[in-house]
A protein has these predicted regions:
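Alpha-helical transmembrane segments and their immediate juxtamembrane cytosolic regions
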Residues: 1-231
Length: 231
């Protein structure tokens, strides 16, 4: 039976993102300076929430099945996300930046050495699915031992303190982040995916516990940001 709560959550997130983009493109910042904070707040909330939903979807659609049975569908999802990135990235370079549609323009996108704007989230979802394929046995364990998501998330969160200035390879930036490229790094966002996997099928008490842990981590991150700024 399909879990409609995931669809509802994703629908709400899509509406929020559309609202944020409308404010970003058509809002009058001079008259309404608070628009910046609304756009930033929604943007900071939306992608982690989408990754959380992606984890829930993976748990429902793939992780309940044996690996050989789940692999073809996971592979198709990875392929669709990757193809969407290629199409979106090429369209951005050609239609928005007016670059010629030639091999030189496409080569960097195909090799992931060129990450065009407005396409970063697509390659992030492709790499998240690839990570789910590689880590399939571990993710299956989380569906049974849901507390595992927390110790597995801590090393990922420590990735927030990596020396981003030294990460200059675009393919590595997709995995770990960088100040040279706009990316949604898989390492730092993977805890949201793990939480989505653990949340699926959890009891009410387990979900309350996960919510409490999320509040604690969020509060700690906010305190760090106020005192030290971004890493």
């Amino acid at each position: 039976m399909r879990d409609r709560s995931v669809d509802l959550q994703r629908g709400i997130l899509v509406i929020l993102m559309l609202y944020a983009h409308l404010l970003q493109f058509f809002g009058d910042l001079q008259r309404f300076p608070s628009i910046h904070f609304w756009v930033m707040g929604i943007s900071l909330l939306a992608f982690p929430a989408f990754v959380f939903c992606f984890g829930r979807t993976a748990a429902l659609a793939y992780l309940k099945k044996p690996f050989r049975q789940a692999l073809p569908r996971m592979g198709r999802t990875f392929g669709r996300c990757l193809a969407a990135f290629y199409v979106s990235g090429a369209a951005f370079r050609v239609l928005r930046e007016h670059r010629p549609l030639e091999a030189e323009t496409l080569r960097g996108i195909l090799l992931l050495s060129d990450i065009p704007g407005w396409s970063e989230f697509l390659i992030a979802f492709a790499l998240l699915m690839l990570s789910a394929i590689v880590l399939f046995p571990l993710l299956r364990q989380i569906t049974c031992r849901r507390w595992l998501w927390l110790p597995l998330s801590i090393p990922c969160l420590l990735g927030c303190f990596l020396p981003y200035d030294r990460i200059t390879v675009p393919q590595l930036a997709l995995l770990m982040g960088s100040r040279s490229y706009v990316t949604f790094p898989v390492l730092q966002y993977f805890p949201f995916f793990l939480a989505g996997v653990a949340y699926t099928g959890a009891s009410f008490r387990e979900r309350l516990g996960m919510g409490g842990v999320a509040v604690i981590f969020s509060a700690a991150g906010l305190v760090w940001y106020v005192r030290h700024g971004l890493p």
